[in-house]
């Protein structure tokens, strides 16, 4: 059942990406396309994880899940900034990208060190594979990264609404609610 869910999610994400791509000739929001690409990678990696036969395959799939998970918030933040006409400086983008790569490096250490996961095994008892992991000392860094991105998105949306910038209030309101 889980494999069917992940397959359906992957197929739908590819369809939505193709729809966005075909509409993209009139839009200039490359970060939204990158966000959709991250969703496709995540869904494909979750499907691969559910089908993994051993720990090495599961860890490889998990690395792709984190590849998408680390960069999706960055692309969503830049999409929000583009839609609301908020300029992110090149320096801020560089710093955020470097931080993302550092966190990505940490998420790739399972199987080599115990920084991110102290121990990893797989469980296939329910007809699909899932990782059974004991979190290491650096696992909270990823959660903090996600929290900071969500907080930044909320602040940018709220600031755009309250400063009455030249942006679509429909976009800002919908983004703030969601």
How does the language model describe each region?
Residues 14, 85, 90, 151-154, ...:
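Inter-domain helical "communication" segments and dimerization helices
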Residues 1-13, 24-113, 137-148:
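Individual alpha-helical transmembrane segments in multi-pass integral membrane proteins
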Residues 119, 144-155:
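Membrane-embedded alpha-helical hairpins and interfacial helices in multi-pass inner-membrane proteins
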